[in-house]
């Protein structure tokens, strides 16, 4: 009962405490996402990375005459019809508990092969988190590279076992080859899922609804449906459950037995596994809904004089939203009892790479926390409600942007476009660091811009020059950009308005049914 025992150990570990990246013994007043669950959620989310232009064009050509969207991010991530058996897969590469790579399958390469190309021998002793169990072709190469551990989501594998009967035999043979590679390799190939700590889902729901992006919509569109967030979340839940879960229990058991997890097919292990998976999907859908594809909202430059120039350099909105959700997930590892902040840095190379992320590649990420190696009682945890400024936390917390820069896995190249996504407006302490590091663009909320609070101020962000700032707001040009129209409508990141005579949002599938 090796796998079942492993699940028991993980459950007891998850129920006890969450091991922190920064301070290993931190047990705060708020529920906290474990590292294992964070990496797992990020791998699932990377599977949904918006498809690059070539994939978008092909899928649109197959639609022949159907204008408008193929759906939200998750719809764009579906594999082409001639490759249904090979599922798109997300991958998180972790070294010494730090994320050093975020990848997803491309049209030509699986996620494991992309990791090998990108990291090479540096994969030695790394932990890899896949959104699906990798195929034998990928596994033999990453095992050969000397990885430490390979974790995967225990549902339909990369070579789908849910495909047509004509191809199921090949899928079963591949699954057997994977098991032989697993049993004869030094790498630990396993399922790492921890139950969420008590009240975690409730906490994520409350904080997602109260986050800057949702509240900005609620304040600027008072006539909007007050329940738009709940409707958006319910749609996401349905879509993600279809993509990442196996609804039929017997079919799920068949898959588990085929991929070597027969010990998890007995209760209570099977029911616990399915519940843990469902809880994580609910959490992912909740966080993803906090940066919604809603009406004309997105990340735009507020300066109307620079709009045309800035748009020529901006990311497509679907990619900007995806990266911001990455940062939102990171924020749930915070060590700040009052507010969690997450930050992620990406860069865009001169040409498209083999990765499913296109020309974009991961630089680093972080969240606000106390210095590495410190214990829970080493520093004050009081906020500005404490009158004695000496025992407040603000002098000791390392900000999310600072951690992302400190623990970056690649250098920032001045000739490339590097961008940082932050869940809150960067403060006066971080703004000069971001500019000094050579980051070209900032994507953030602007709720706190120009404010000066008791221990922290946000005055410099509005005055910042030389760095493009894209904040969450209504499209200031007054034109709704049709994100899923013909491929020419978004070329090299250029957002172009539709012809005036064309119906805005034609066949548009929003997160909301009505708006």
Go through the PLM ranges and name each one.
Residues 1-515:
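Zinc-dependent deaminase catalytic domain
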């Amino acid at each position: 009962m090796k796998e079942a025992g492993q699940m028991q150990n993980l459950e007891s570990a998850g129920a006890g405490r969450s091991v922190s990246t920064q301070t290993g013994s931190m047990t705060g007043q708020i529920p906290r996402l474990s590292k294992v669950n964070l990496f797992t959620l990020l791998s699932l989310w990377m599977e949904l990375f918006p498809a690059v232009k070539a994939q978008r064009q092909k899928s649109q050509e197959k639609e022949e005459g159907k204008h408008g969207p193929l759906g939200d991010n998750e719809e764009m991530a579906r594999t082409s019809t001639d490759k249904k058996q090979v599922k798109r897969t997300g991958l998180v590469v972790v070294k010494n508990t730090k994320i050093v790579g975020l990848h997803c399958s491309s049209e030509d390469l699986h996620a494991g092969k992309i990791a090998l190309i990108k990291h090479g021998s540096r994969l030695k002793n790394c932990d890899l988190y896949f959104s699906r169990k990798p195929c034998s072709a990928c596994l033999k190469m990453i095992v050969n590279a000397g990885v430490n551990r390979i974790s995967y989501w225990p549902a339909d594998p990369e070579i789908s076992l849910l495909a047509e009967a004509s191809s199921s035999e090949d899928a079963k043979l591949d699954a057997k080859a994977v098991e032989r590679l697993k049993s004869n390799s030094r790498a630990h190939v396993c399922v790492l899922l921890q139950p969420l700590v008590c009240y975690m889902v409730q906490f994520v729901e409350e904080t997602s609804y109260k986050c800057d992006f949702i509240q900005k919509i609620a304040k600027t569109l008072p006539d909007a449906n007050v329940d738009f967030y709940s409707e958006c979340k319910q749609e996401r839940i349905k879509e993600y459950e279809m993509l990442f879960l196996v609804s039929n229990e017997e079919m799920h058991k068949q898959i588990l037995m085929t991929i070597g997890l027969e010990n998890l097919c007995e209760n209570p292990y099977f029911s616990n596994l399915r519940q843990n998976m469902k809880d994580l999907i609910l959490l992912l859908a909740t966080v993803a809904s906090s940066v919604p594809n809603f009406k004309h909202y997105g990340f735009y430059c507020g300066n109307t004089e620079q709009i045309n120039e800035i748009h020529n350099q901006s990311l497509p909105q679907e990619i900007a939203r995806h990266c911001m959700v990455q940062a939102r997930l990171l924020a749930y590892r915070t060590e700040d009892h009052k507010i969690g902040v997450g930050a992620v840095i990406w860069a865009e190379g001169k040409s498209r790479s083999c990765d499913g992320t296109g020309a974009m590649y991961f630089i680093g990420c972080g969240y606000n926390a106390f210095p590495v190696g410190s214990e829970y009682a080493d520093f004050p945890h009081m906020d500005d409600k404490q009158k004695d400024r000496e025992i407040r936390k603000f002098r000791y917390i390392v900000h999310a942007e600072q951690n992302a820069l400190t623990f970056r896995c690649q250098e920032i190249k001045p000739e490339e476009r590097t961008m940082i996504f932050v869940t809150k407006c960067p403060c006066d302490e971080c703004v000069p660091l971001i500019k000094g590091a050579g980051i070209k663009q900032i994507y953030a909320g602007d709720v706190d811009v120009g404010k000066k609070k008791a221990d922290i101020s946000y005055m410099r962000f509005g005055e910042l020059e030389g760095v493009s700032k894209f904040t969450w707001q209504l499209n200031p040009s007054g034109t709704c950009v049709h994100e899923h129209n013909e491929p020419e409508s978004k070329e090299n990141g250029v957002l172009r308005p539709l012809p005036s005579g064309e119906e805005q949002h034609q066949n548009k599938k929003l997160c909301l049914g009505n708006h």
